[in-house]
Amino acid sequence: MTIATEISCPEEEAFQLLDKYSWFPNDDQRRWWEYTGPNLLKLLRDAQYPQKDQISCLYLLQQLLVPYLGTFPVAGQAPLPWWSNVTTYGVPFELSWNLLHNIVRIGFEPLSHLAESGVDAFNKIAPEECLSRLACLDNTIDLARFRHFQHQLLVTPDEERRLLEEKGPLPKSGRGQQALAVEFQNGGISAKAYFFPGMKSLATGLSPGKLILDSIESLALPGLKEPVHHLCNSLGLQDDGHPTDTAIAPFLLGVDLCTPERSRLKFYVTDQVVSWDRVADMWTLRGKRLEDPQCADGLTLLRKLWDLLEIPEGYRSNIRPDFAFGTPPPEDYRPVMMANWTLSPKKKFPDPQIYLLTVGMNDAVVMDALVAFYEVLGWTDLASTYKDKVASY
């Protein structure tokens, strides 16, 4: 007797298969599912994930992520009760597709009614709960590093009390201290955590850069000393964690939630000076990485993308605008630049990633630039279908 093990259904029925008898405790969760489910499915199809993986990814979204997305945003209605750090508009959910490695990813900040009502004023409960449930489903998710940085970078109960009692009204945005990401690959998942030390900085008086560097140092990994030294030297980070250039601001630490020996750390900054010279400095660590042929090749491609996008150079405000959901940003809005560096004991220099933010730019112009760049890379199939793919979402 043969037992079939493959799940088979027409692609258009994959969402309906899970939706037909789904139950949600409130309308917000139902609406999150109806919005995110089809979009995730389409992205998985575009990335050519096997159908059985598409269904399991959808099921994970429905059962484990949707319950932690909070109030569903509606254009023209009251602002969201919790303004997330994950996206420009404060929405706690972001889908993305890593084209180079063909990995679909969900970035999100787990929320609950406790955070939205102010009871959990710094949203410490939902991320912990959600991640613990994820770890129960997949034994490749290791929480050792997560626990370490929780202890180092989240406000303590005493610090939380002082912030609420002594610091006056806290800003609407920036109160979140943690975000998560789930990547779908090889038929399973991997997870990452992100720590925003802004509230810890406000409570302790220590700079975000100092808090992040101290938390890394407390891991006591000898192999990290050299890459951290090169990073600090290139960014001009002083003993107090402040860069000598005040336009640069450390603000975020990312960590892979896998076994500690494989876990990478990512150190994030924003830069208010947006220019090609700054991009080149960040990519090469002020020239230190140029001896690496991959660095030079990457710099050439970066220059090509920079020229194609025609991002206006200049100095940007670092004040986070209060965008209204569903409305475009002002025509004169220009975002800061972002970068991160991956710190690994196995590498002398940290590996950079540069974020050329296009919020506020014309979408058609950006798409034309990306199509031209994909052609430069030899990704002809993607170049020929990219605009139609984007328009279909």
Curated annotation (Swiss-Prot):
CDD domains xrefs: PT-DMATS_CymD (cd13929)
Catalytic reaction(s) noted: 12alpha,13alpha-dihydroxyfumitremorgin C + dimethylallyl diphosphate = fumitremorgin B + diphosphate
One GO MF term: prenyltransferase activity
UniProt binding sites for substrate: 94
Enzyme kind, highest EC tier: transferase
Example GO BP: alkaloid metabolic process
Signal sequence region: none
Keywords carried by this UniProt record: Alkaloid metabolism, Prenyltransferase, Transferase, Virulence
Enzyme Commission number, as recorded: 2.5.1.110
Similarity remark: Belongs to the tryptophan dimethylallyltransferase family.
Function of the protein: 12-alpha,13-alpha-dihydroxyfumitremorgin C prenyltransferase; part of the gene cluster that mediates the biosynthesis of fumitremorgins, indole alkaloids that carry not only intriguing chemical structures, but also interesting biological and pharmacological activities. The biosynthesis of fumitremorgin-type alkaloids begins by condensation of the two amino acids L-tryptophan and L-proline to brevianamide F, catalyzed by the non-ribosomal peptide synthetase ftmPS/ftmA.
Name listed for the protein in its UniProt record: 12-alpha,13-alpha-dihydroxyfumitremorgin C prenyltransferase
Organism field: Neosartorya fischeri (strain ATCC 1020 / DSM 3700 / CBS 544.65 / FGSC A1164 / JCM 1740 / NRRL 181 / WB 181)
Gene: ftmPT2
